[in-house]
Amino acid sequence: MIKGIGIDIIEIDRIGQAISKNNGFMDRIFTLNEQRLFEEKNNIMETIAGHFAAKEATAKALGTGIRNMKWKDIEILKDSLGKPYVELHNNAKTLADSMHIEQILISISHNKSNAVAQAIAI
């Protein structure tokens, strides 16, 4: 049973600007595991923007948006085949558990200017 759906789109340039203007942006938004994934990519800005959109989409699927949780409470990782998956921590996990959410499915895509992600909580 679907318990929540979220979608987010972001301009890749906005992420680049946020990183340039705010020294703490990456550490505030992304876990060390996520940052390690970015280091492995050639198209790093597209990947970072996609992960940011995935966090937003996941928060929307939980029905709250980012309020009442921290960005790092939602972690977007990749399996051995490169498929993204969501790991929830702290307040995000507590909320998902209270909603009896067993899994959040995530899909991420981008073109040269935008990144988009959709999350489905089941």
From Swiss-Prot:
It is found in: Cytoplasm. The keyword Cytoplasm applies. Gene3D superfamilies: 4'-phosphopantetheinyl transferase domain (3.90.470.20). It is an enzyme of class 2 (transferase). It catalyses: apo-[ACP] + CoA = holo-[ACP] + adenosine 3',5'-bisphosphate + H(+). Its EC number is 2.7.8.7. The keyword Magnesium applies. Its cofactor is Mg(2+). Transfers the 4'-phosphopantetheine moiety from coenzyme A to a Ser of acyl-carrier-protein. Belongs to the P-Pant transferase superfamily. AcpS family. This is Holo-[acyl-carrier-protein] synthase. The lineage of its organism: Bacteria, Bacillati, Bacillota, Clostridia, Peptostreptococcales.
